[in-house]
């Protein structure tokens, strides 16, 4: 009776991790020899781990990453791929998010820009940041609809609160004036307060004047920039 009553109270207090750990302790004879402080410490450790797992699960679900399982540990390091390991380590640390930097991933189709952006989004979730993946054409359609139903301002506020916003397929097609203005609103609201990742097929400015052939310095180029803030 006392066992079920205690478990019920733990669940009422939303201490699911402690409840599971307590059930395990009751079934493991070795735990009976532990002191009260030792058993309590194990229960608290399990609760913290359980909450971390639940928070990560929630953040990953909200992020809506195109490649939900993408992670930096699985980055393809085969010979022939030019990877700046120090840059990858810096990005993995999350310092660029804390410093409100933004990332631009450029390169031709198929080099892994979207996968890498999703891996960075997943890493951000691991570190407790919120993330959101959106294809730029889909975002523009959402903003167009928001103008019509009166939710444009609320949509901008929601986007401005995301710690890491991933905008895929940036510059895929020419934009009308209204669409350019909407994107500027999104970027301006996030300037200096949140981080944004853009992926684009647009080449870096390495081509010669008048050149019509896109050129990239590497298969997938990474650049970061800081949006100026008003003093």
Swiss-Prot record:
UniProt-listed CDD domains: AAA
Disulfide bonds: none
Keywords: ATP-binding, Nucleotide-binding, Transposable element
InterPro entries: AAA+_ATPase (IPR003593), DNAC/IstB-like (IPR028350), IstB (IPR047661), IstB_ATP-bd (IPR002611), P-loop_NTPase (IPR027417)
Entry GO MF terms: ATP binding; ATP hydrolysis activity
The keyword Nucleotide-binding is assigned to this record: yes
Residue numbers binding ATP: 107-114
Top-level taxonomic group: Bacteria
One of the GO biological process terms: DNA replication
Matching Pfam families: IstB_IS21
Protein family membership: Belongs to the IS21/IS1162 putative ATP-binding protein family.
UniProt cross-references to NCBIfam families, sorted A to Z: IS21_help_AAA
Protein name: Insertion sequence IS1162 putative ATP-binding protein
